[in-house]
């Protein structure tokens, strides 16, 4: 895999932005074998620009204001070319360049000949545009720096890129690139395969952008929130593409095996986040959150524990790998993000539970007196019980029968006393992980709180 940084735009190219790209790629496990920076390949770019110029397919533009492309003329009309510069004789052009006058180098787009520029796109099919409608775009700016068009094409030619895949908003640029490819390589050589992908848009239909939707478009936002990289890749692949069957949750290898350019949709893909988000979860598309939860559930316990343990320790809790291995299967079905471990399993990590409402101890169709009887009997029973799933099951169900209660009425006060909440993992497994000493201590504290 080749990684090429298109860094010729000096204003936008910062160390922070480059490091962010590298961090995101590494998190996604997209390693690379070779690394190129366009800014270090300027000699190649200028060599190809000069070759095009020597073929008579480019000209110097000495107009001071012309440092790039996309200029406008009056009444909102798109600028196409400057006749005075386009028709400047080679001798006059050489004289002015030799005198040190700065110039931009522009491609000499064929005009008045009825020519068409065409290419076949793997997603959007046959694309045709009249050459007369394409401006004489810049190859080199007046400061000598190559434009995006020239640098990208020059590097694609040199590195022998076979497929050029980018956003649909680059379709208009591709006509210019076809002209560059043919001018640099010769008309008889095959073009790369072009494929333009549908755009990712916000719920309001606007294109996603760093300026407006910063966190949503940053890969590191998903990483820091606790997404698994395979889940994020799964989500990205399903934006504008779907397999031929009805699968949604797919591994990396399954995605590789099923993917084809022909399966990409032409319609823009909507990323359904809330704007503005009122909770961290609303920053993300619900489908992405669901996929992440599914990928978490599919992880082997040891792998999940290895991901959760650094998060727990970073939060200041001293937890052993052995204990984390015991906790992970209990919360695997209950978390959507890796960082949810800090709220789903916090009662496993603390010595003292935070305050909770004693009313939570009261079982369904019961009262405070019933809750107190349950906890008192549980303290007696658990003191002599074997702290295994089967041992706790047998002891507590027998105690419920003695008290004339349903199992749920027996279990709820114990669960709240042990975990500080009604919504917690399965009771017996939870008590085993907490251990006899901690369980009895918390039940004792709950009893004192009710008196």
Question: How should each PLM-predicted stretch be described?
Answer:
Residues 25-29, 53-60, 75, 111, ...:
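A generic secondary-structure signal for well-formed alpha-helical elements
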Residues 21, 52, 56, 107, ...:
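Residue-level signal for inorganic ion chemistry
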Residues 3, 60, 64-196, 201-211, ...:
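Active-site cores that bind ATP or allylic diphosphates and position pyrophosphate for catalysis
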Residues 3-7, 159-165, 217-218, 395-397, ...:
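Glycine- and acidic
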Residues 388-433, 447:
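Helix-rich, typically C-terminal accessory recognition domains appended to large enzymatic cores
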């Amino acid at each position: 895999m080749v990684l090429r940084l298109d860094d010729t735009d000096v204003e936008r190219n910062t160390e922070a932005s480059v490091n962010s790209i590298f961090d995101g790629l590494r998190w996604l496990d997209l390693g690379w074998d070779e690394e190129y920076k366009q800014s270090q390949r300027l000699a190649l770019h200028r060599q190809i620009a000069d070759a095009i110029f020597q073929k008579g397919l480019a000209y110097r533009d000495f107009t001071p204001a012309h440092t790039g492309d996309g200029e406008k003329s009056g009444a909102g009309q798109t600028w196409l070319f400057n006749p005075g510069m386009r028709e400047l004789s080679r001798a006059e052009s050489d004289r002015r360049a030799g005198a040190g006058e700065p110039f931009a180098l522009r491609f000499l787009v064929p005009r008045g000949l009825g020519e068409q520029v065409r290419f076949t796109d793997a997603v959007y099919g046959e694309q045709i545009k009249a050459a007369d409608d394409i401006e004489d775009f810049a190859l080199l700016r007046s400061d000598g720096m190559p434009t995006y068009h020239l640098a990208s094409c020059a590097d694609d030619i040199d590195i022998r890129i076979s497929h050029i895949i980018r956003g649909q908003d680059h379709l208009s640029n591709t006509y210019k690139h076809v002209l560059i490819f043919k001018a640099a390589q010769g008309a008889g050589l095959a073009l790369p395969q072009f494929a333009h992908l549908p755009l990712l848009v916000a719920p309001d239909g606007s294109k996603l952008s760093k300026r407006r939707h910063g966190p949503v478009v940053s890969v590191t936002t998903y990483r820091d929130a606790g997404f698994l990289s395979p889940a994020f890749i799964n989500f990205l692949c399903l934006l504008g593409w779907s397999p031929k069957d009805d699968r949604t949750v797919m591994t990396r290898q399954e995605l590789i095996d099923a993917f084809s350019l022909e399966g990409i949709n032409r319609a823009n893909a909507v990323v359904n986040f809330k704007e503005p988000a009122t909770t961290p979860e609303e920053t993300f598309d619900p489908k992405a959150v669901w996929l992440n939860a599914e990928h978490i559930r599919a992880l082997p316990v040891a792998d999940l524990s290895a991901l959760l343990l650094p998060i727990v320790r970073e939060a200041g809790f001293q937890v052993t790998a052995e204990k984390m291995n015991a906790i992970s299967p209990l919360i695997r079905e209950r978390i959507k993000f890796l960082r949810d471990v800090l709220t789903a399993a916090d009662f496993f990590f603390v010595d003292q539970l935070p305050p909770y409402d004693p009313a939570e101890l009261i079982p369904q169709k019961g009262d405070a007196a019933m809750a107190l009887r349950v906890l008192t009997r549980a303290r007696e029973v658990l003191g002599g019980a074997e702290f295994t799933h089967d041992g706790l099951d047998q002891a507590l169900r027998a105690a419920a029968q003695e008290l004339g209660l349903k199992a749920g009425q027996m279990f709820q006060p114990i669960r709240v006393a042990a975990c500080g909440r009604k919504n917690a993992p399965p009771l017996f497994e939870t008590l085993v992980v907490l251990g006899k000493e901690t369980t009895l201590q918390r039940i004792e504290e709950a009893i004192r709180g009710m008196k």
